[in-house]
Design a protein with these regions (language model features):
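Boundary at the C-terminal end of the N-terminal hydrophobic targeting segment
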Residues: 21-23
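Bacterial N-terminal signal peptides that target proteins for export
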Residues: 1-10
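Active-site-adjacent, His/Asp/Glu-enriched structural segments that form or flank metal-binding
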Residues: 64-181
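Short, linear, compositionally biased motifs with a strong N-terminal bias
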Residues: 14-15
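Short alpha-helical segments used as structural interaction elements across diverse proteins
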Residues: 3-4, 33, 159
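Mature N-terminal segment immediately following signal peptide/propeptide cleavage
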Residues: 28-63
Length: 182
């Protein structure tokens, strides 16, 4: 019996060692050679790729390594709430001016302008932006900058968004789950 346990332990050790060695020898994930990448002094990693199609359109994304996993129990939902607040005023686009500007150039909220929060990331996107005028790309990059570091978090907007978040939670959560959580 001792011999059996010893052999099992040795086999487990060898399998574990082989798995560790194998995982360290995995090749890197292939990257698209047309994607330019870099890292800014502030730690932001960027990826830029030129596309010919669709013509005169661009997509903009900012992905932050923050999500619900970083919340304490008394902060539950805060990451999602901040995601919503990005559309309610920033330093360079106060109040509703962010939506108004993007809609004026053909970007529709909820279709081409959206965001999501998951366990470990929050991603904002502005898609299918018609880059037909000078300054549109710069404005979209400024929006990404503001989303990363310059939300206004106006108390009136916070109160308005609180109701939106509550209704979103209510419609996505079944009655039994809501009763369980209260």
């Amino acid at each position: 019996m001792k011999n059996f346990y010893r052999k099992t332990l040795i086999a487990a050790f060898l399998i574990g060692s082989a798995a560790t060695a194998f995982s360290q020898q995995m090749p890197p994930i292939p990257t698209d050679p047309d994607v330019r990448t870099g890292k800014l002094e502030n730690g932001l990693t960027y990826y830029i790729r030129h596309n010919e199609l669709p013509e005169k359109q661009a997509d903009f994304y900012i992905a932050q390594k923050v999500g619900s996993i970083l919340e304490e129990d008394n902060q539950r939902g805060l990451a999602h709430f901040l995601e919503h607040m990005c559309f309610n005023g920033t330093k360079n686009f106060p109040g509703n001016s962010l939506r108004e500007y993007l809609e004026s150039i053909g970007v529709k909220f909820g279709v081409n302008l959206n965001a999501y929060t998951s366990i470990d990331e929050t991603v904002y996107n502005i898609n299918d932006v018609p880059v037909i005028r000078e300054g549109i790309i710069d404005s979209c990059l400024l929006i990404l900058h503001d989303w990363a570091d310059d939300l206004t978090l106006d108390p009136k907007e916070i109160d308005k968004e609180r109701g939106v978040i509550h209704e979103e939670w209510r419609t996505r959560t079944g009655a039994m789950m809501r009763m369980y959580e209260t």
